Amino acid sequence: MAEKRQAYSVPEAMKQLIGPGGQKWANMDPEERMLAAATAFTRICAGQGEGDSRREAQAGQYDPYSKASVTPGKRPALPMHLHFPHTASRVTSSTVSETSQKCRKPVMKRKVLRRKPDGEVLVTDESVISECESGTESDLGLWDLRHRFMNLQFQEGTESPVVTSQKFNLPCEYQGISQEDQLICYLQREEMDPPVYEQDLIVASRPKSFILPRLDQLSRNRGKIDRVARYFEYKRDWDSMRFPGEDHRKELRWSVRGQMLSRTEPPSKPQHVYVPNNYLVPLRWGVRCDLANGVMPKKLPFPLSPS
């Protein structure tokens, strides 16, 4: 359990920042002054409340989001070596690391946190580098690797780049590339753990990380595609996959149409011969006269009722 943070007042913080007689503040360069002032301000704010106590207790845990938040500032592109005789001791990595701590300053980066389907956290750096920052390294780990690589070359200064490439067991096509690329190829050949962050491999000749689009992200915009274009896409796929022996509909329709056009006209049907009907319908007055005179009506050509 994290112990309670000590409360810092403004006079105590200023006294600790300036030092006795102001000598500590006078011996600092502008970057160190800004860093010390920011640290004192953070301590004052943290002393007024216990909001950072929980964060301090969890500082020992691995937090990729916090690791990718701040990157060191400008540092030399290559580690600086002091050329002494072989009897003199060379500069160790700890001394160079202490020197780099003084040369760098915190710089905020634009980061993106994504979670993979398996639950793994992936933090990528999408910040834009200006031309003045293009020659700086982003991670201290890569800088230490470059330092060890340069120490190895300093120990074997008489060896040529071809011999160095053969020592790292690099293929022939990797012998003409830069030292940074040779180091990366060597780490990949030795199956060493790759850096967790893409900005760990950012060098002066390489751009910032580019995030490739995922397939599931592309499928989200499928509904925005033109429906007519999708219809022709499906139609093209359907036409490309045919069953063996299947007749194409278009060819079948055109063949039936040709058969219909090539036929002769059908023969005309025999027309019905109509017989004229000469029957005269008697009027009511004539029927009454015939009935009064006893004249029987003529025989009808058809029966009145069906038999």
UniProtKB/Swiss-Prot annotation:
InterPro entries per the UniProt record, alphabetical: Centriolar_ciliogenesis_assoc (IPR052319), HYLS1 (IPR026227), HYLS1_C_dom (IPR027918)
Example of a GO biological process term: cilium assembly
Cellular component, GO annotation: centriole; cilium; cytoplasm; nucleus
Protein name, entry field: Centriolar and ciliogenesis-associated protein HYLS1
Cysteine disulfide partners in this protein: none
Tissue-by-tissue expression: Expressed in hippocampus and dentate gyrus of 3-month adult brain.
Native organism: Mus musculus (Mouse)
Keywords: Cell projection, Cilium biogenesis/degradation, Cytoplasm, Cytoskeleton
Job description of the protein: Plays a role in ciliogenesis.
Gene: Hyls1
